[in-house]
């Protein structure tokens, strides 16, 4: 588990779970540079539940396909936990395109989006997905 940015009561907490450490590090830097988010990276999906319990995220960005554990299995563990069941989860994957995501695709009730390749796309995704910002 790698936590970046300074904790603040006004900063939303985002957990990024992906076996690709390059993606989690880049995404963490993008979000951290806004000074609006406290970000935690987890590259071992088998530790995602424990990391989420310790970090108390406001949002979880979760890779859908990982070698050690399927993203849907990880999401099921998180949503069945009494402390975490209300935390929004967004699946991020390289398996769909922006066009395919426009129809509001969901897996097990969770939004599915293509992995953001640009910092502005990532920031927009986080802002749309956070309960405080999305109107959810």
Task: List each model region and its residues.
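Active-site beta3 strand of CheY-like receiver
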Residues: 55-61
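Active-site residues of response regulator receiver
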Residues: 18, 63, 93
């Amino acid at each position: 588990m790698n936590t970046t940015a300074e904790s603040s009561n006004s900063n939303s907490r985002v957990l990024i779970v992906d076996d690709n450490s390059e993606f989690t590090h880049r995404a963490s830097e993008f979000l951290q540079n806004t000074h609006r988010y406290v970000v935690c990276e987890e590259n071992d999906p088998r530790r995602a539940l424990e990391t989420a319990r310790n970090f108390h995220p406001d949002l979880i960005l979760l890779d859908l396909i990982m070698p050690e554990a399927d993203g849907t299995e990880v999401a099921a563990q998180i949503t069945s936990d009494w402390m975490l069941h209300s935390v929004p989860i967004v699946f991020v994957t390289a398996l769909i395109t922006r066009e395919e995501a426009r129809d509001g695709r969901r897996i097990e009730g969770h939004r599915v989006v293509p992995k953001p390749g640009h910092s502005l796309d990532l920031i927009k995704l986080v802002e749309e997905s956070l309960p405080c910002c999305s109107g959810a």
